[in-house]
């Protein structure tokens, strides 16, 4: 607003917050393309701005993506993305397709999840338009573990990972159970009871998932 138009503000930003100065004047067209494309959609039933989950859109300004590029999250042709996607795979794409994860995080009913093959790019985990959570993460601090429906809080950024990095119990009517992954093992919950008490992993008192892997 006009209250921010104070002499010296711009010079102070450039001097003390150079990374912010580099992102000044970022507007809709930087991510969504030229507005001249929109008149061509006049009369369409569902007129929307062009959107893309391609990492190159974010990479125009954010260059810290080497770690992501070297992970399987970026490999769209990997079997983890190609096999579980497609029609009839609505229960899989929450984790195995970028669009499905976004729909899950936005509270879309499961039978309406997007099922197209899509790697987990930047905008899958980070919401470009919502800064409610730190790092603009779509899922933060709390997650419900699959199988037992156990709610876990206080996870911080690691909740983003634990949505998918957990096992699924074997259903009685068949299906594809998943072996347990880091989330439940790290927390020492969501397992079977055998009448013997075992100490929790020491990692429960140490930094969580993203502190080591990001």
Residue ranges of predicted features:
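Short sequence/structural segments immediately N-terminal
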Residues: 1-214
